[in-house]
Amino acid sequence: MYLEQLLLVGVLGGAVLSLVGVGFTLVIGVGKVANFAHGAFVAVGMYLGYWIGHTLGLNPYVLFVPALLVFTLIGWGIAELFEWRGRKVGAIGELLVGLALLLLINGLLSVGFGPNPVTLSNVEMGSVSVAGTRIPGSEIYAAVFTLVVGAGIYVFLRGSRWGRALRAVAENPQSAALYGVRVPIAQRVAVTGSIALAGIAGLVISPFSVLTPDVGTNFLITAFAVIVIGGVGNTVGAVFAGLLIGVVDSLAIGYLSTVWTTLGPLLIILAFLLIRPVPVEI
Amino acid sequence: MNTRIFGLSVSALVALAVALAAGWFLLGALGAGTVAVLVLALYYAIPAASFNFLFGSLGVFSLAQAVFVAVGAYTDVYLYNVYGVSPWLSLLIAPVFAGIIALPIALASVRAGTGAVLTALITLIISEAIPPILIAIKPLGGAIGLYVKTKANPSFWDMQFGSGVSFARMFLVLNVLIIVFMMWWNRSRFGFFVRAIRDSPDASAAVGIPTARMRILTFVIAAALAAPAGVVFAQYSLETTADLFLGGTALFEVIVIALVGGAARAWGSVVGAVVIVYVANAMSNAANGAPGIGPLTFAAVFVVIAVAMPRGLSGTWALLADRRRRAAGGTLASPPAPAAEPEARPVDDHAHRATEHDVASG
């Protein structure tokens, strides 16, 4: 019984990690940009949800569509910024911009919302009972959201012309360009999409998460773990890797001491890196 | 013409000696508040120099340098509290420990690949993994950390000084030593090896440079450079905790200072540290010490640097100096500025390479 509960919690938590990881795998695979601020945008989404719920007293999900639009616009701006720095200074320029954005967002959140952890407690969305565990409605919504978005991205990448173009760029940008794919546009789309996805994922999980200003760094590491385990540019691999990390994390919390819950995932990443190095030069 | 001792230009050494002497006496004349800021700046400059040493010579973007500072601090406090080992001795022991701990980290990052981004992520993971490990080791005090056992009448060997001035002077001396070392390294055979590896791993392997060994050696030396800072800082703050060195902001502040200073010149990290710590302190004071203003200032300055001068203050200086020299019709006498990215190097790359080659064989 206890095991089933842990598995359930793990899958629900892992679903969100999958979503964050899918974005990161797109941005590295297609955009060829290691966006260090990827996790920070999850944090922005989380605090946006907190602000809506806490200050405005609304259900964070009400502002889902406007938030998506705003994140897409911001994402496009950031994509332009990466493109510009990449052209001028190369990969290091992009790395610097990502790192700078990560620190800036951490700093702004810390000044704006205080350095202490906060939770959103006044949002009630009902709950369901599965396998003897009470699961809050928000977590169900988050899982459904992940499922829908994950399936949508899969269909988009496999079925549409745009998706095929993105996959071609991930595979080989030079050849894709020769075949008429507008590589810079494809890369901007990947960066924009990943940032929008990260922000919205943050908004979706805000009702049941603990928010700290530097939570973005943790999400960056998880996203990195997802691409290391799932493979760069492999969205299906990213989904499974996210679920795996969620379940392992949940089991570690259930059965092992607290040291292992923080250390375990990091050791898994390092082990994976040593056994199977990342094939792409990033 | 510039005379050289062991490959170091005499004029640069004289300038350093003058700066050291001036700094030494200036520190004695400053108020306690300014000294406290300078202690922090000069302390941060050391791990930042260690980062720039790695990044400038090998192009390795390591976020793990703060780990080696923590290793130094824990080594010092543990040895002093348990065995009564003098911190002065720890200054020599800590680099050895840091080097040993750097070995597997270096192996992991060399094994994983050569990409700067990948190395950055791996070293970030390592620095996030170290605090839980430190906290789990019971003799190291867990989450509370270790406190230096203070004495009522400390002798010189206990390295417990009442005022910050002595610590600031110690950090100053450490910084100068590191600058001298880096100047020597850049001119030495090793310096040419690692720069060759950075610019073209395949070509340097083909001409017989032991690329893997040089990478690991450079990584280990960088770790050893960072460790003494931890020893002195632990004595200054009389404690060592994982959070002090590896907390969310402390970890990134080192990187920000290093990148603001730039890796093009050995003095980059010191200048970067003094500028940014001073600005952050001033901003924090202006906001009446509101929490988070200091780190936010770091971040804001970093954003400006990342967008406006990606090679940092010293990189921009080097660029201007070379331009001036070229305008005067001279040759490029300065060691080639470690460009942020090999592909993005200036067009007159051949001039750089030619100078390098001449010095290496001569």
Whereabouts are the PLM-identified features?
Chain A
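Pore- or pathway-lining transmembrane helices of multi-pass membrane proteins that form conduits
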Residues: 40-44, 51, 86-110, 216-228, ...
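Inter-helical junctions in multi-pass inner-membrane proteins, predominant
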Residues: 1-16, 157, 161, 190-227, ...
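Transmembrane alpha-helical segments of polytopic membrane transport and secretion proteins
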Residues: 1-2, 78-88, 276-282
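Single transmembrane alpha-helix segments in multi-pass membrane proteins
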Residues: 2-54, 83-89, 229-235
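Cytosolic-side transmembrane-helix boundaries in multi-pass membrane proteins
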Residues: 112, 171-185, 255-282
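Helix-loop-helix "hairpin" substructures at the membrane interface of multi-pass membrane proteins
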Residues: 13, 19, 131-211, 235-241
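Transmembrane helix-bundle core of multi-pass membrane transporters
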Residues: 85-159, 186-189, 251, 256-257
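Alpha-helical transmembrane segments within multi-pass membrane transporters and channels
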Residues: 24, 57-101, 108, 240-245
